[in-house]
Amino acid sequence: LILTALVFVHFLQALKFNGFLSIIGVAIFLTSRITVLAAATPLIDSIYFLNVMVVIFLILTNRFNLFFLFMPLTLISKETLLPFLFLVVFKEEFWANKKNIAKFIAALVCAFVVFILSRKFIQVDGEKAKGIGQLILALLPNIPEVLRAIMSPQGIFNIFNGMFLTYLLSLYAYFVNKMDHLPRFLKFYVFIPLVFMLIGGGVHMGRHLFIIFPVAISCALITIEHFFKAASST
């Protein structure tokens, strides 16, 4: 989690946030309920957060060769990292070099090979984990029930999970400022955790949604920055 926080600092600075706002952003991440739980218990979420953070940082800073080298390692922790890898195609700089397409495909194949081998040789205790496809198929007939669960008081509590103020500030940036401060690929990023939240359902909705933190906290900082500028101009 410390490594994730360090990468997050550089990520926020790459988005042109000043040092003060970057520190606030990292503090929000480190003090969130999900992060505290991940630090207190041996959950794989810690590695998951780090991998997602590294992926989007490398894409943001156009370090595509490092991104391709890192791709085979990502799926070892969680197969749900796969959709995040495709965010690179929404980066305009990715298409500037045609070789990037071939490199991306090769890295993707290597990632799948590493994933298959890791699942073959690494035994998981307890009930066998379901794949994304199985979870989606299980979700489809239960969509009304999932939506009712989300709208219930317990569902709302599970979703926010101590991040209510951050999500509220980020929504202001999304609807008022249109997230103009953020590159296009991060605007597509937000849909992945939302889908995972619907698929996961139950008490884990907040955990699945929390992976939105790089964009949610960035948008919250945009709102804070906007309020600071408005206050200083009055």
What residue ranges belong to the model's regions?
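Membrane-interface alpha helices of multi-pass inner-membrane proteins
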Residues: 53-58, 65-90
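Perimembrane helix-loop-helix junctions
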Residues: 83-109
